Amino acid sequence: MIQQESRLKVADNTGAREILCIRVLGGSGRRYAGIGDVIIATVKDALPGAGVKKGDVVKAVVVRTAKERRRPDGSYIKFDENAAVLIKDGGDPRGTRIFGPVGRELREKKFMRIISLAPEVL
């Protein structure tokens, strides 16, 4: 469950290491984002010489949350950390690699490019 001011680890090779959520997209009163939801964030920590710099405002899709999520079959999924992947306006990832597992909910939200790059889909 991600909300404004939540900090997330970046799970791709764009050069950003940590981002801070500044807006959850999807309605004026939307408060929380889960796996597969798009957020607007600012880069808080980045590698030198990377494609993104500290202070850049970016779009990202949440791929892991520490808060458990109930699935339609009754099972629950949760991860050890909150993580996101930076995306372009079209929804394609900005990086060329994705690190760590991602949630199956991304498939339902049509983020197929992220699913294909991920090493594991849980």
UniProtKB/Swiss-Prot annotation:
Alphabetically ordered keywords of this record: Ribonucleoprotein, Ribosomal protein, RNA-binding, rRNA-binding
SMART domains registered for this protein in UniProt: Ribosomal_L14 (SM01374)
SUPFAM superfamilies hit by this protein: Ribosomal protein L14
Keyword Ribosomal protein: yes
InterPro entries: Ribosomal_uL14, Ribosomal_uL14_bac-type, Ribosomal_uL14_CS, Ribosomal_uL14_sf
GO cellular component terms, semicolon-separated: cytosolic large ribosomal subunit
Range of residues in the leader sequence: none
Annotated Pfam families: Ribosomal_L14 (PF00238)
Disulphide connectivity of cysteines: none
GO aspect biological process, one term: translation
Gene Ontology molecular functions: large ribosomal subunit rRNA binding; structural constituent of ribosome
Keyword Secreted on entry: no
Highest taxon in the source lineage: Bacteria
Similarity field: Belongs to the universal ribosomal protein uL14 family.
Function noted in UniProt: Binds to 23S rRNA. Forms part of two intersubunit bridges in the 70S ribosome.
Subunit-structure text: Part of the 50S ribosomal subunit. Forms a cluster with proteins L3 and L19. In the 70S ribosome, L14 and L19 interact and together make contacts with the 16S rRNA in bridges B5 and B8.
Name of this protein: Large ribosomal subunit protein uL14
Organism listed in the record: Acidothermus cellulolyticus (strain ATCC 43068 / DSM 8971 / 11B)
Gene it is expressed from: rplN
